[in-house]
């Protein structure tokens, strides 16, 4: 209701309605609650990012170790079914290297590809990634700079080869152990 008294306009506040100061107080409380919720959400997001970064750092550290172990086997002979030390087949080499880095892998290439969930494209390879060729019949470990370490076949030795040519055309996929 509006009443005029001596040139002044007075508004009557209906029963149960809020005054301007009460509305301002409620708005301030809502704003404070929203700010607190936003701060909690930001802290939670930061914690999630920190946890992901820590996992990625652990995986990278293990991958470096696996690459170093695999590189150390260069010159060892290929022997079908061998898991080292001293002789390896292709899947035995990568299994041995990752085991030394603290990650257990299945024994054969096809199981390694199937059981490791983190799949990686050719363009996104990182050192330590396992690369599969020839319908999962061969596996090697990416060591960076367009090269892989692998135990090729009977009569040959563990070696580091450049990627390209037939390897790219027979590439099936790659996985990232320990991720």
Sequence positions of predicted segments:
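Glycine-rich catalytic cores of cysteine/serine-nucleophile enzymes that process amide/ester linkages
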Residues: 2-3, 75-88, 133-168
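N-terminal secretion targeting segments of exported proteins
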Residues: 1-58, 179
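Stable alpha-helical elements in mature extracytoplasmic
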Residues: 62-66, 70, 90, 97
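Short, low-complexity, Pro/Ser/Thr/Gly-rich segments in the mature regions of secreted, periplasmic
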Residues: 173-179
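Extracellular/periplasmic catalytic domains that process cell-envelope and extracellular macromolecules
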Residues: 61, 100, 122-126, 132-134, ...
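Short, functionally critical alpha-helical segments immediately adjacent to catalytic or ligand/cofactor-binding
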Residues: 69-72, 128-130
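Catalytic cysteine-centered active-site loop
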Residues: 76-126
């Amino acid at each position: 209701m509006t009443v005029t008294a001596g040139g002044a306009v007075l508004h009557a506040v209906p029963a149960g309605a809020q005054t301007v100061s009460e509305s301002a107080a409620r708005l301030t409380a809502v704003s404070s609650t929203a700010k607190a919720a936003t701060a909690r959400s930001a802290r939670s997001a930061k914690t999630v990012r920190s946890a992901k970064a820590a996992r990625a750092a652990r995986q990278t550290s293990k991958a470096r170790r696996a690459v170093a172990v695999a590189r150390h086997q260069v010159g060892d002979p290929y022997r079908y079914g061998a898991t080292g030390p001293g002789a390896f087949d292709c899947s035995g080499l990568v299994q041995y290297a990752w085991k030394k880095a603290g990650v257990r892998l299945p024994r054969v290439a096809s199981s390694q590809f199937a059981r490791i969930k983190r799949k990686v494209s050719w363009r996104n390879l990182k050192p330590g990634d396992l690369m599969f060729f020839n319908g999962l019949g061969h596996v090697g470990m990416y060591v960076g700079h367009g090269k892989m370490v692998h135990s090729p076949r009977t009569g040959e030795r563990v070696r580091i080869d450049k990627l390209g040519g037939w390897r790219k055309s027979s590439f099936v996929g790659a996985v990232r152990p320990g991720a």
